[in-house]
């Protein structure tokens, strides 16, 4: 990757980007019919794709990204976030100016007022909800929702949805048999693995005892049996809950090296304080602390990219629904006037099946 902001003299466009466009090689070949490329960077592909196709370039991008493109001639800013919001993108308006960043604290550093949202915190503590896709836990600070883009100039701000998850799901052709469904799923999984492992930096694997990461490890081993992968897994020393025995059994069938990352009560407390400072908003419990420790260990050892089962839990719908949890204990600890600020978001119901609406609630 090149230094950012990235400027393309041919198109007059400037880019800042966080993420990866997995099919950038294919897009480069297609765009070479119309442009001369001066580098081998993804950034140049993104800018020339936007110059050629405008907003519709997003439909051609296969990847995870948060991008901002400034057109010097038109004096307009275009921002977009990937289909499922893997990469964060926050923004705020102040005195007619638009501020944006991949972390909320960067907006505060730029002078945006730092004021917690009482309504959002009340909703979180009473209903265990993070609110609507555009909300944050800070007043007048917003996130661009997954699958949305934004146009901004000196006189207007226009936010639009470019990817509609429910329509994409409903347009998928249903396989005629279990065999066909299995073959199609494996084909898509293999394509995803090949794209993600095509990196110019050291790649490792984050392994738990779950079905998702175990499946991915098996798939990676089938595709790349002799690559020098380093596998990371965390444990706490509790034989009744640790998954380390399963990970060791899995890896006994491979040539991959296992790096075990231990968690102790002292480490958990230290990570909790650190992650609270980093995240700017509530995080998803103990697993976030464990992964933070695991990621920092991998980074110290020179492993820059870690593959894991992120996304497969959603595909297989194996998460519990937080709305089913008993909130009575928490509510009894809150003042009545604070609880009155809480509101349960009215989420969309695009599917006929209510189970589907609950399963994919965070994706639209």
Model-derived features: positions:
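Glycine-rich active-site loop/lid subdomains used to bind and stabilize high-energy intermediates
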Residues: 94-95, 154, 248-364
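Cysteine-centered catalytic environments shared across enzyme families
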Residues: 1-280, 291
């Amino acid at each position: 990757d090149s230094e950012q902001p990235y400027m393309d003299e041919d198109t007059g466009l400037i880019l800042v980007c966080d993420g990866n466009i997995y099919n950038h090689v294919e897009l480069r070949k297609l765009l070479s019919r119309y442009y001369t490329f001066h580098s081998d960077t993804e950034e140049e592909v993104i800018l020339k794709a936007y110059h050629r196709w405008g907003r519709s370039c997003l439909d051609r991008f296969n990847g995870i990204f948060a991008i901002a493109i400034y057109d010097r001639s038109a004096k307009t800013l275009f921002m977009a976030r990937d289909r499922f919001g893997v990469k964060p993108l926050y923004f705020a308006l102040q005195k007619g100016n638009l501020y944006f960043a991949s972390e909320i604290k960067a907006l505060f550093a730029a002078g945006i007022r730092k004021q917690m949202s009482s309504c959002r915190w009340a909703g979180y503590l009473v209903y265990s909800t993070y609110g609507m896709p555009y909300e944050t836990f800070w007043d007048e600070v917003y996130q661009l929702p997954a699958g949305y883009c934004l146009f901004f100039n000196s006189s207007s701000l226009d936010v639009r949805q470019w990817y509609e998850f429910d329509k994409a799901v409903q347009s998928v052709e249903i396989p005629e048999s279990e065999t066909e469904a299995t073959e199609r799923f494996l084909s898509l999984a293999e394509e995803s693995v090949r794209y993600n492992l095509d990196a110019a930096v050291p790649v490792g694997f984050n392994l738990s005892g779950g079905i998702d990461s175990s499946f991915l490890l098996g798939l990676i081993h089938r595709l790349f049996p002799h690559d020098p992968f380093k596998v990371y897994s965390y444990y706490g020393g509790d034989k009744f809950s640790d998954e380390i025995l399963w990970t060791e059994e899995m890896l006994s069938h491979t040539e991959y090296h296992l790096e075990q990352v231990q968690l102790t009560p002292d480490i958990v407390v230290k990570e909790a304080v650190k992650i609270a400072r980093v995240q700017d908003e509530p995080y998803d419990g103990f697993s976030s602390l464990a992964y933070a420790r695991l990621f920092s260990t991998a980074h110290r050892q020179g492993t820059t990219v870690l593959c894991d089962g992120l996304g497969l839990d959603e595909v297989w719908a194996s998460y519990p629904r937080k709305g089913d949890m008993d909130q009575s204990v928490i509510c009894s600890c809150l003042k009545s006037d604070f609880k009155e600020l809480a509101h349960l978001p009215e989420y969309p119901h695009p599917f006929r099946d209510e189970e589907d609406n609950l399963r994919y609630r965070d994706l639209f």
